Amino acid sequence: MRKKIVVGNWKMNKTVTESLVLAAEVTAALGEGFTGCDVGIAPPFTALYEVGKLTGSRLALVAQNCHFEPDGAFTGEVSASMVREAGCSAVIAGHSERRHCFGETNAIVNRKVKHALSEGLQVIMCAGETLEQREGGVTGDVVTAQVREGLLGIDDISNIVIAYEPVWAIGTGKTATSEQAEEVHLLIRNTVSDLFGEEAAGRLRIQYGGSVKPSNAKELFSMPNIDGGLIGGASLNAADFVAIVKAAV
């Protein structure tokens, strides 16, 4: 039985002070000793250290991104070792906004995954198709390529989580049904099985990241290949986020 994992991605929201308030609200609402599923939050870089001091081991601290080089002349970038030292145990790689706003390719995502793993971080690697790709009938090709190329040259996926983000269902007014999400999650698991074997694929946790809300979380998380969520907007409200977390139990 795969343990569900729910991570709140705060994106470019919340000052340090606001982040501390939200983190405190989440930990208080979850209560002491919550073990029903793995829970993490990904505040902005500026708040990581302070939030980590506040939450301790009660919540996994996740970085929203990192560079693929350990150091050097890369103005504005942050390395995996830097976020690890700030208290992070995990990092997101290849989020759809990084791909579409900043031009990150599958090859770049692959380098980030490898570097983060080498620093001992868990990696949440994202994959997903756009509305144009969905309507063009190439969802399978796009997602399979993202998974295959993102995991190229990696031997051990035990510290990897994959998050499926149907970009076409985020902010477009279109909604992915639980069946549509499950179909792609199964495709991802089968792709990983082809690469790493059935046993490794069976252990892999695959999150769903397409506008999860308290109202649809339970149904999504009941699907056999959906192992939790990578939560965007709803994670900025403690009550909504905790409701989603508890739907995973």
UniProtKB/Swiss-Prot annotation:
Q: How does it assemble?
A: Homodimer.
Primary location group? cytoplasm
Query: What is the protein name stated in its UniProt record?
Result: Triosephosphate isomerase
EC number in record: 5.3.1.1
- Give the matching InterPro entries: Aldolase_TIM, TIM_sf, TrioseP_Isoase_bac/euk, Triosephosphate_isomerase, Triosephosphate_isomerase_AS
Q: Which residues form the active site?
A: H95 (electrophile), E165 (proton acceptor)
| Stored PROSITE patterns | TIM_1 (PS00171), TIM_2 (PS51440)
Output the CDD domains linked to this UniProt entry: TIM (cd00311)
